[in-house]
A protein has these predicted regions:
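Conserved N-lobe ATP-binding subsite of Hanks-type protein kinase domains
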Residues: 26
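Conserved N-lobe loop of protein kinases adjacent to the ATP-binding glycine-rich P-loop
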Residues: 31-39
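Regulatory alphaC helix of protein kinase catalytic domains
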Residues: 58, 62-63
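A short, aromatic-enriched beta-strand patch in the conserved N-lobe beta-sheet
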Residues: 78-79
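Conserved short submotifs of the Hanks-type protein kinase catalytic core
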Residues: 84-97, 101
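AlphaC helix of the protein kinase catalytic domain
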Residues: 99-112
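Activation segment signature within eukaryotic-like protein kinase domains
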Residues: 121-122
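Catalytic-loop of the protein kinase fold
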Residues: 133-149
Length: 153
């Protein structure tokens, strides 16, 4: 078995591969050697936070992440700031996003997800949104790409 070398290391975290890219951040799959678990790491270059509003948005995102404690909301594990980057360490969801899952399902089975499976997914999404709304948080970008799946292993 070949052991992969990490792309980079920050304290007890080994960044193994890029699993997502966005306009302002990359997301890495990392290993937390201290907790012996996989985490997702949102890496935001400080250079992307050039305006005061962008810094305010990052602080607000962190406040919300630390406040939200719900089984169907991805939890924050840690936050680190270096000279060049901000790192948000999150629970890793091993199933990818719902958009990719639906596309793969349709490609493989030649029909959309069945109604019972969609209901099962919604029974997990709705309580999370209700919890957020009860805490005066409105998610302004609900879409399949932003719904992450976690399959039992």
């Amino acid at each position: 078995m070949k052991v992969r070398k990490p792309l980079k290391k920050l304290e007890n975290y080994r960044f193994m591969e890029v699993i997502g890219r966005g306009a302002s951040a990359d997301v890495y799959l990392a290993i937390d050697d201290k907790a012996n678990q996989l985490v997702a790491v949102k890496s935001i270059p400080s250079a992307k936070l050039t305006q005061k509003q962008e810094e305010t948005n990052l602080r607000r995102e962190l406040e919300i992440l630390y406040k939200m404690k719900h089984k169907n909301i991805v939890g924050i594990k840690n936050y680190k700031k270096t000279k060049n980057n901000h790192y948000i360490f999150l629970e890793y969801c091993n199933g990818g996003d719902l958009d990719d899952y639906c596309k793969e399902y349709i490609f493989r089975y030649k029909h959309p997800l069945n109604e019972l499976y969609i209901q099962k997914i919604l029974r997990q999404i709705v309580p999370a949104l209700q919890y957020m709304h009860n805490n005066n948080i409105i998610h302004r970008d609900i879409k399949l790409k932003n719904i992450l799946l976690n399959f039992d292993t």
